[in-house]
Amino acid sequence: MSDRKAALDMALRQIEKQFGKGSIMKLGEQAEQRVSTISSGALALDIALGVGGYPRGRVIEVYGPESSGKTTVALHAIAEVQRNGGQAAFIDAEHALDPVYAKKLGVNIDELLLSQPDTGEQALEIAEALVRSGAIDVIVIDSVAALVPKAEIEGEMGDSHVGLQARLMSQALRKLSGAINKSKTIAIFINQIREKVGVMFGNPETTPGGRALKFYSSVRLEVRRAETLKQGNDMVGNKTKIKVVKNKVAPPFKQAEVDIMYGEGISREGSILDIASELDIVQKSGAWYSFNDERLGQGRENAKQFLKENPEAAEEIESRIREHYGLNGEIEVEAPSEEEFEDLPLDLK
């Protein structure tokens, strides 16, 4: 038995010498037992994700119909990372990012790294270089459907390019997944929806880019508009449902409902009010909302406005919600140290 133990110890030392410290270990000896996360910027989504935000070092896919709020969800994650002193990058393959809207959502556009690549290969190579630097906390690729292979761009309009994009995504994710995990970068891929032709039974909807992204994603979010929010006769936003379709770090299939207000993004006050009402932290009597025997307002929109004008009350309610769900605020953003980066295998630097 001792000979086997000695042989195993020698093998482990050899592996660590060749591939770096931490390349193999016993599961219980891992330095970080708890999943390290960064808040999504939406309280309801943090709760639905089960761990208080997006897990670091993982691939996230956000998909849904057009104008459902996919890019808004991703921009809120960028704003949250920047608020905590982290670095973010946005690969704009659709060439459609609105800097004015991003700024309104809290994104520091002066610090945001932006690339508008010409081809899918270029986009993914830029993403790979940024991830391997070890200095990026979140990178957003918008969108997978717009990652057009070079052969398709250089070819004629009517040419058939079957499976090219799927092959590109499969190859890219094989290379990226290890580097994403080592560098603790959150990679958010935004995706569109297509319909499969001739499907008689079941859901005909599918996402472009093949199956690879579905497999490599630790979290998949489906974003859909539920209803239009009105103030009088004016349409002011959308109530949006975000369903956690896949989750490798917590139980899946939870759902978050958020208000996406036009020109403002996800309403923090709306999420606080809805969740606090469910937990009876905020009491609702008829149309009136009250907290600590103080009336917040008559009707949901008035109560939201009160919380916007009184951030102290909103903070107190939010802290009680986080305490109830065991979400102890945002987790600090830290880039890998020079020592950690030196430990990476050469092919992951």
From Swiss-Prot:
Pfam family, one: RecA
Keywords, in A-Z order: ATP-binding, Cytoplasm, DNA damage, DNA recombination, DNA repair, DNA-binding, Nucleotide-binding, SOS response
Bias-annotated ranges (Acidic residues): 331-349
Entries under CDD domains matching the protein: RecA
Binding, ATP: G64, P65, E66, S67, S68, G69, K70, T71
Subcellular location: Cytoplasm
Lineage: superkingdom: Bacteria
Region (Disordered): 328-349
Gene Ontology cellular-component terms listed: cytosol
Keyword match Cytoplasm: yes
GO MF annotations, alphabetized: ATP binding; ATP hydrolysis activity; ATP-dependent DNA damage sensor activity; damaged DNA binding; single-stranded DNA binding
Biological-process GO terms, alphabetical: DNA recombination; DNA repair; SOS response
Function summary: Can catalyze the hydrolysis of ATP in the presence of single-stranded DNA, the ATP-dependent uptake of single-stranded DNA by duplex DNA, and the ATP-dependent hybridization of homologous single-stranded DNAs. It interacts with LexA causing its activation and leading to its autocatalytic cleavage.
Family statement: Belongs to the RecA family.
Official protein name in the record: Protein RecA
Gene this protein is translated from: recA
